[in-house]
Amino acid sequence: MTSSNAGAASRRAENPRARNRGVKPLLPRRPCGFTLIELLTVIAIIGILAAILIPTTSSARTAAKKAKTRGQFAQWGAAIESFRQEYGYYPTFEISGAGLNKVNGNTAGGTNLTAVHRFYETLVGTRRDGSALTGAATGNPVPPLGQNTKRIQFISFTEADMVPVSTTDSSLLTKRGLIRDSFDNTDIAVLVDRNLDGSIKFSAQGGDGINTLPLVSPPDSTTVRLAPNTTDFPTATQGGVRAGVVFYCMPPNGTSQTDLLMSWK
């Protein structure tokens, strides 16, 4: 061995770091899986996220249904306005009984789609089963046959607008064949500017045949029955509501007048 090689070997022997260069140190192996503390931390984070997201998702779903219901009100109102443009007056729906000034009037839910439904028949020109309107054309109120004398179809109600007769949903069995909003609510008020003065007014002096505003209930309660207050629906002396047609209903969980969904608000 040459002196230079011997010197290099001697230096490597004297320098253990150089001798071990290139050899990776062995790291202690980490146990597989999570520790109890890590699992509890993850569970806590999931709980916090769920508490944030679930109410947000529910609120978003409710807001979407409210928007859809407003869209329904707009379509129904447009059909009624088309009727007025065709005949020169607004149609008359129910004028007495529990269904006074209601979309479904006094029509009971069920499988008999030939039973008179004034709102549907007047705007569609047929019965709910598609058969032709028959019977008297005069009366009080005037039957649909005497109002839509040309049998013009002003609107086409879809399944989203009506509870199917074939439904097996126990909460909807008593509402079969009735018009509904996006919350499956069938208790919906409808008011029109009967005297064509540009606004809808209630009271005996209002001129629109609306003595009092109809009370409506949410689909999940029969004990809550409310109508708009005078802030939302001004009295006749205050000018009423500037509109030709208005609708309102109470969404689920509604308990006060501020919860009402009103087409003009």
What are these regions (language model features)?
Residues M1-F34:
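N-terminal leader/signal peptides at the extreme start of proteins
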Residues S3, G33-T35, T167-T168, T174:
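Asp/Glu-centered strand-loop micro-motifs enriched in Gly/Pro and often flanked by an aromatic residue
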Residues A18, P28-R29, E38, V42, ...:
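Generic detector of low-complexity/intrinsically disordered segments
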Residues G22-V23, C32-L36, L49, G109, ...:
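Terminal low-complexity, poorly structured segments
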Residues K24-L26, T35-L39, I52, G99, ...:
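Acidic/proline-rich low-complexity IDRs
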Residues P31-A60, K65, T69:
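N-terminal single-pass transmembrane signal-anchor helix
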Residues R70-K265:
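N-terminal pilin/flagellin-like segments and related low-complexity appendage regions
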